[in-house]
């Protein structure tokens, strides 16, 4: 179904949109059966209103931008449909399990997220739409099923910012707010963010059926993921081993991209890892400002398990958890009659796949860092040069984003042009020593300074979602002023462009930003 993009027809789009979202034939995950989910309506959200809307995601879903101005839009995406949901079209919450902070947590599930259906994308793919903050579900445990305005704005902005940085991610169509109070560390207001992704299947979905000794359901889930998202795995000698490899390699690529832009996820539990290798579950995330390899963005992470430098190791560990969950399926095609022999071979095969994570991650990060340094040619010492820069930045707490962006101003032959980036370092002599090494390396390049600068500015964003920028937008939104949410979203659509009229958004964080804390409370 294609929706009209004209403003005049936007009102007529809403009923068709609601019907299409609920079409049972299109909701592939639901067809897996009741063991995978629970269907239930969203909890009504009183007097909802639109806080933020992504034209880009609307275009992806072939929705007219004017649809957000229609009165029924906020109702629909608050989980307050204007018609009764028929039983076959009821939203659903899925069940999964997982490891949280390295400890087995048992059954978890969508405690405040409800998938309301899927829509065809203009890119030929199909996308599920999920309401985060839609109310209590059977998996809410002690939670109230709500999300707050603060965290919903952060997820909305960062989902779209990451996409425009070129990093695989779930998307966000809209944020719907309300004046309904919810209790967190203080009284806040409820909101709903509409997540958009090809799939919300996590490592934890596989762990759930493995831990419950349901190889039949585990296989059903794996077949669903393979057939819909990894069809090439079906032709492999062992489709389930191929699935593990594909997910492992995508995860390695993803985390390399995180590291390259200074992104910290904050809560890399196995239930927060996408089987598609995309960034999912934006909670206590953060972009590193003053660089610290041990930076912890999540105030709740007292052990530093998910610190910046730990992210590759944790991602690899999470892939081991996925491998364990898939072991009952690996090797089934080999026809080994003896269960112990099959299990032993499955372990060996899985370990061989998992060994590919560092083999994939290392070169991926090296390529990213080479691009950030403007090095078109590959040389043996490039990784050491990049690591030396990070060490120098760490020692001086130099700003991550500004340092890499300003490196483009360095000249092969003129050290006097170093000042903009040099001024970011406390230890100027240490920077000078590194800059001399860098200039020597640049002398091996064939591009001139101007061409290199253009390439570097395509690899090093000028604008990222710093915590203080999000905080300003959140504070204004609490006063019903959503202009800063819109302005920030527009700036972050073009993170690599100069945008001189928005120079203040690329500046060093103000002193008060140092007191900001984000945690798992959302």
Curated annotation (Swiss-Prot):
EC number per UniProt: 2.7.7.-, 2.7.7.108
GO molecular function, one term: ATP binding
Keywords, alphabetical: ATP-binding, Magnesium, Manganese, Metal-binding, Nucleotide-binding, Nucleotidyltransferase, Transferase
Pfam name, any one: SelO
Superkingdom of origin organism: Bacteria
Class of this enzyme: transferase
Catalyzed reactions per annotation: L-seryl-[protein] + ATP = 3-O-(5'-adenylyl)-L-seryl-[protein] + diphosphate; L-threonyl-[protein] + ATP = 3-O-(5'-adenylyl)-L-threonyl-[protein] + diphosphate; L-tyrosyl-[protein] + ATP = O-(5'-adenylyl)-L-tyrosyl-[protein] + diphosphate; L-histidyl-[protein] + UTP = N(tele)-(5'-uridylyl)-L-histidyl-[protein] + diphosphate
Co-factor requirement: Mg(2+); Mn(2+)
Keyword Transferase among record annotations: yes
Active site: 271 (proton acceptor)
HAMAP family hit by this protein: YdiU_SelO
Cited NCBIfam families: PRK00029.1 (NF000658)
Family according to the record: Belongs to the SELO family.
Protein name in UniProt: Protein nucleotidyltransferase YdiU
Organism name: Burkholderia orbicola (strain MC0-3)
Protein encoded by which gene: ydiU
């Amino acid at each position: 179904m294609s929706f009209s993009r004209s403003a005049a027809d936007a009102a007529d789009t809403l009923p068709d949109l609601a019907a299409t979202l609920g079409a049972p034939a299109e909701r592939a995950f639901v067809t897996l059966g009741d063991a995978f989910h629970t269907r239930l309506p969203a909890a009504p959200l009183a007097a909802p209103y639109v806080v933020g809307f992504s034209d880009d995601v609307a275009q992806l879903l072939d929705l007219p931008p004017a649809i957000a101005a229609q009165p029924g839009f906020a109702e629909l995406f608050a989980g307050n449909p204007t018609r009764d949901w028929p039983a076959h079209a009821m939203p659903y919450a899925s069940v999964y399990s997982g490891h949280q902070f390295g400890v087995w947590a048992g059954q978890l599930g969508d405690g405040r997220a409800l998938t309301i259906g899927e829509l065809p994308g203009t890119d030929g793919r199909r996308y599920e739409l999920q309401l985060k903050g839609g109310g209590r579900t059977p998996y809410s445990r002690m939670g109230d099923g709500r999300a707050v305005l603060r965290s919903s704005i952060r997820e909305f902005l960062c989902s779209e910012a990451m996409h425009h940085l070129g990093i695989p991610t779930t998307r966000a169509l809209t944020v719907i707010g309300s004046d309904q109070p919810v209790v967190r560390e203080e009284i806040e207001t409820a909101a709903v963010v509409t997540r958009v992704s090809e799939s919300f299947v996590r490592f934890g979905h596989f762990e759930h059926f493995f831990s419950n000794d349901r190889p039949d359901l585990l296989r059903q889930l794996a077949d669903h993921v393979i057939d819909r998202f990894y069809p090439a795995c079906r032709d492999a000698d062992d489709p389930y081993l191929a699935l593990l490899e594909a997910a492992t390699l995508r995860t390695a690529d993803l985390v390399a991209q995180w590291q390259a832009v200074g992104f910290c996820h904050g809560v890399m539990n196995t239930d927060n890892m996408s089987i598609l290798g995309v960034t999912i579950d934006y909670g206590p995330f953060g972009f590193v400002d003053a660089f610290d390899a041990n930076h912890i963005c999540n105030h709740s992470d007292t052990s530093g398990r998910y610190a910046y430098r730990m992210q590759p190791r944790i991602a690899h560990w999470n892939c081991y958890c996925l491998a364990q969950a898939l072991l009952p399926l690996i090797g089934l095609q080999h026809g080994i009659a003896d269960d112990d022999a099959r299990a032993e071979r499955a372990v060996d095969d899985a370990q061989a796949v998992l060994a590919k994570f560092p083999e994939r991650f290392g070169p991926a990060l090296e390529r990213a860092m080479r691009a950030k340094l403007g090095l078109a040619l590959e040389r043996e010492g490039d990784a050491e040069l990049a690591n030396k820069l990070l060490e120098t930045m760490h020692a001086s707490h130099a700003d991550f984003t500004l340092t890499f962006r300003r490196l483009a101003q360095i000249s092969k032959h003129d050290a006097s042009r170093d000042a903009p980036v040099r001024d970011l370092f406390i230890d100027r002599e240490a920077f000078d020593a590194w800059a001399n090494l860098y200039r020597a390396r640049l002398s091996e390049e064939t591009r001139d300074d101007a061409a290199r600068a253009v390439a570097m500015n395509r690899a090093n964003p000028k604008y990222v979602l710093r915590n203080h920028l999000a905080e300003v937008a959140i504070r204004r939104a609490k006063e019903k002023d959503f202009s800063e949410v819109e302005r920030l979203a527009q700036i972050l659509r073009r993170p690599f462009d100069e945008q001189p009229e928005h120079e203040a958004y690329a500046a060093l964080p103000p002193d008060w930003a140092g007191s900001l804390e984000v945690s798992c409370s959302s």
